[in-house]
């Protein structure tokens, strides 16, 4: 019996260890105060845009303008014209100043569960002013006000090669004209044109599919009499550190793939990059054939992806003075002969990290290992198959909550051979209990002799006392992998289950504090000290399921162990109340299946757990009555 209790205690201790590690390593970091973005002076046409990114430094001359200087100049995009973007997934505008994509909303996702809440805004212009697309109806007051958000945008251009006048290439502040297309959408490309007046005509064509992928084609037509050399580039720029989850388990920051090698830099790590000549704090990686680079958030991402097979330089950099985080894709210099045209094509992903969509882009147009942009974590070898199985079950069932329950059954089925072996071993241990008691009486206080004879007994009866530990140990990586799936995959964001559970990626919103909504006051919100004591329904069910699982075995005789058993379910009930409801649902289902399995298998081997007897024996009133009865009998 002591071995059975030891296994249960091991399960509890390992689970507590999981919680302890979580609280130490995965706790949110304090969010630093937001830094104000410096404001700005008008620059001439081929100069770095105000408040915009520094021009790429991979210029043959080896010089890169300071980001601080760029951020200190005014933003011409505030007064430039705009072209509308409209699809079933995206809405926004392109600024003719630099041709930057700096105004983008995800129309399939809202900020909150409230259907009246605004769409998720992914990209924002440098100037927080009215944005009115050309050709679109004028809203009251002359336009639609954008929500206040730190500037975040994509911009393309050309860098002059050695000997080329920088004024002859379009930069982030160049004002383009629309050559064709009134609105960008699926099957509706838009082409912008800029003539440098010296014999070179630059064009930029934007195409958009029905999801989140832009195709950007830059051309350089040389109508002059001499060869012209320049290097195309793409930039993603974020002004100031964005609001992040700050969880150790989640990567937020620069992300990329460079010839099969994953590149990840958190925002705080980007500020600590080694300074490079002409660059500032930066990291440059030469990509020979396939790669991409961008920024990733928990659910959203922007990525620059040159055409497959295209060599380029992947750059992650930071400008301390302007507080701008930047990723770049710098293509090689092109020398265009008179009468010829140079072309550079690349892709821009700007949207939600939906597995099906990203996996589709990995196939067509062939963005290398694009699914690795989803943060699968340390246990990726478990996280990926668990997610795919959950995704398939969701497609079959149509409800993510029931899919999690079905997934739990499948996982328990996979580990059933080990669980069965464990429960059979526990039943055999019960059979050996009388012999172990006899050994204990015979050996007295000689612990070494007792252990030796017990091990000989196990060997003789072919019993493995450690068999019960294996299923428990196996649960730990499964738990972390499933947590990763629930925490980082957008498929669970705002996914409902039943009744009041409308978001399986968020904690259960019910609360014992107001009798689950029956009393006319609100429960303490997250961040409040009292929030830990609100006790949602799922947390209570978890505590009850853990308590019932304990009662399959008699309480240990050791007082310390008995106290651990008594408190552990209720401690976990409070600890896990703030976890994602999908994860708590998994744990409740897992405990319930474990109870049924253990009761059934042990009963089949002649040792049915005395569930109600164990409950009665653990009650203090019964223990006291037994003590009094014993005292009377002694008299």
From Swiss-Prot:
GO terms for biological process: protein insertion into membrane; protein transport. Residues 33-61, 615-635 are annotated as: Disordered. The gene is yidC. Belongs to the OXA1/ALB3/YidC family. Type 1 subfamily. This is Membrane protein insertase YidC. CDD domains: 5TM_YidC_Alb3 (cd20070), EcYidC-like_peri (cd19961). Its main location: membrane. It is found in: Cell inner membrane. Required for the insertion and/or proper folding and/or complex formation of integral membrane proteins into the membrane. Involved in integration of membrane proteins that insert both dependently and independently of the Sec translocase complex, as well as at least some lipoproteins. Aids folding of multispanning membrane proteins. InterPro entries: Membr_insert_YidC, Membr_insert_YidC_N, YidC/ALB3/OXA1/COX18, YidC/Oxa/ALB_C, YidC_ALB_C, YidC_periplasmic_sf. Gene3D superfamilies: 2.70.98.90. The keyword Endoplasmic reticulum does not apply. It comes from Paracoccus denitrificans (strain Pd 1222). The chain crosses the membrane at residues 8-28, 396-416, 470-490, 528-548, 564-584. One of its GO terms (cellular component) is plasma membrane. One of its GO terms (molecular function) is membrane insertase activity. Residues 624-635 have a biased composition (Basic and acidic residues). PANTHER family: CYTOCHROME C OXIDASE ASSEMBLY PROTEIN COX18, MITOCHONDRIAL, OXA1.
